[in-house]
């Protein structure tokens, strides 16, 4: 699990009493080695994420890759999907979903401007995650890229806290959404999903 406090609440809710092993982006090889050892002993392991589906923009994907590489077909990996902002957002956005590009979290600095230009040039739905600290900057960069590509009217949908108590969805151009968040600073909290229409 990423955070024992979060996972412990879930397990307590269903009266499940099992030992927890922390695994996150900074866990390093020690946690991976422990998981491989437990699997080698025939133990069953559950990969639990704090939010969303394990392995989707989540450090769990590296663990699954390592298990597959080291143990191959000797271990059975099953998916029990949880809520995912990616699929939940696409299902209510009203955009083409037969073909889309998912970028996960955008880089903080290096390559970000180039990526925004690539997003503007894509002719399919584009989806990415953004943090509350960078959502306004992302919308400004997206507006610049779409304007440079002569597509400033392209529809953008920003979804916040999907499947949670303070869920909200706003749509418009990138420029309109920038104004929206400036006018509603209390909405610049939580986890964001950004969907750019083709």
Where are these regions (language model features)?
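General beta-strand structural signal in soluble alpha/beta enzymes
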Residues: 2, 77-82, 128, 158
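Short, well-ordered secondary-structure micro-motifs
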Residues: 33, 58, 89-91, 113-114, ...
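Short hydrophobic/aromatic-enriched beta-strand-loop microsegments
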Residues: 17-25, 77-78, 97-104, 149-159
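Class I S-adenosyl-L-methionine
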Residues: 1-78
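Class I SAM-dependent methyltransferase SAM-binding "motif I" and its flanking Rossmann-like core
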Residues: 62-122
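A contiguous loop/helix-start segment that scaffolds small-molecule binding in enzyme catalytic cores
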Residues: 40-44, 125, 129-198
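RNA substrate-binding interface of SAM-dependent RNA methyltransferases
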Residues: 1-19, 79, 87-95, 101, ...
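Short, acidic/turn-prone active-site loops that include or flank metal/cofactor-
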Residues: 4-5, 22-29, 83, 103-108, ...
């Amino acid at each position: 699990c990423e955070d024992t406090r979060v996972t412990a609440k879930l397990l307590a809710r269903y009266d499940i009493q099992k030992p927890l092993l922390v695994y996150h982006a900074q866990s390093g090889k020690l946690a991976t080695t422990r998981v491989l050892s437990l699997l080698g002993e025939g133990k069953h392991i559950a990969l639990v994420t704090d939010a969303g589906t394990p392995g989707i923009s989540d450090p769990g994907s590296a663990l699954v890759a390592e298990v597959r590489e080291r143990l191959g077909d000797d271990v059975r990996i099953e998916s029990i999907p949880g809520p995912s902002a990616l699929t939940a957002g696409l299902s209510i956005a009203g955009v083409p979903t037969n073909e889309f590009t998912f970028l996960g979290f955008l880089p903080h600095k290096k390559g970000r401007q180039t990526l925004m230009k690539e997003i503007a040039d894509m002719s399919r739905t584009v989806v990415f995650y953004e943090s509350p600290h960078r959502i306004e900057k992302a919308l400004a960069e997206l507006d610049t890229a779409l304007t440079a590509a002569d597509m400033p009217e392209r529809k953008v949908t920003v979804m916040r806290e999907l499947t949670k108590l303070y869920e909200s969805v706003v749509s418009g151009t990138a420029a309109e959404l920038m104004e929206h968040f400036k006018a509603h600073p209390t909405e610049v909290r939580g986890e964001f999903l950004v969907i750019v229409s083709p």
